[in-house]
């Protein structure tokens, strides 16, 4: 005997629920944004291991925090002291010194820029952290102007450089002396500003570089002639090279360069060569070091210039 059953059509909402049930969901593939890397290209590139070459060494008693290079002179930085040396002869030309424990008490770094020596100053190791930019005349070493950040949640200003039409900077936190108990060195970051020092963006430091800087953070930094950002920690003889991510808030670590220097502020030569001026703070030396090319072909990382 054959049995016939009458099938009643399912209501439309039940059909919709069937398609949306687990195992039946039909999710269209997200369109690829023009210029964005494919998923396979979003994995960070391998970190290159490179070696710098020392070219020249200067004996500089003031080489304690860093050095800034001009065309004919370099300027050694030591907290509240700025010393001017002739590049060709290594001769001391002049020295500026602030009052002990005065308003300029901890210059972390300086840069020679548009007829000025611009220096990152902080109240380290005092807390709350306060920072300012102090400017000097490169000829007379006379102090000419000051810009105060006051207290910022980002931490203590350690270095800054030109970036697009504004600035790129580092604000640091510390695990020990000079830090605060609720923020360790991992809260350090790179921050961008416009010409009037209004914040425009920023990034976290990559863990692979940050762990090498602990318990401090980035004490020196500058964009190189190749457009990558180069960073020095507090004491390791290593230069960390990072790029901008195409997505996300963390810088991309692309290379580590072994150099004969132990951290802190450095400066690129003004002649456009791949040479940096850096210091050995324990021996009170300034060294010029040739930096090898950093070649990275990866769609997930971009240069700063």
Where do the model's predicted regions map?
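A short helix->beta-strand "capping" segment at the edge of beta-propeller domains
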Residues: 37-61
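Beta-strand-rich domains and repeat architectures in extracellular enzymes and scaffolds
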Residues: 54-80, 106-108
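Surface loop/turn motifs at the tips and blade-to-blade linkers of beta-strand repeat domains
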Residues: 55-61, 97-102, 147-153, 203-214, ...
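Residue-level detector of Asp-centered blade-edge/turn motifs that repeat once per structural unit
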Residues: 69-71, 112-114, 162-165, 223-226, ...
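Blade-loop segments of beta-propeller domains
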Residues: 91-128
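Short, conserved, GDST-rich strand-edge loop motifs in beta-rich repeat architectures
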Residues: 120-130, 170-187, 288-291
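Beta-propeller blade signature
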Residues: 130-140, 184-197, 241-244, 291-294
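Conserved blade-ending motifs and adjacent loop-strand segments that build the rim/top face
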Residues: 249-270
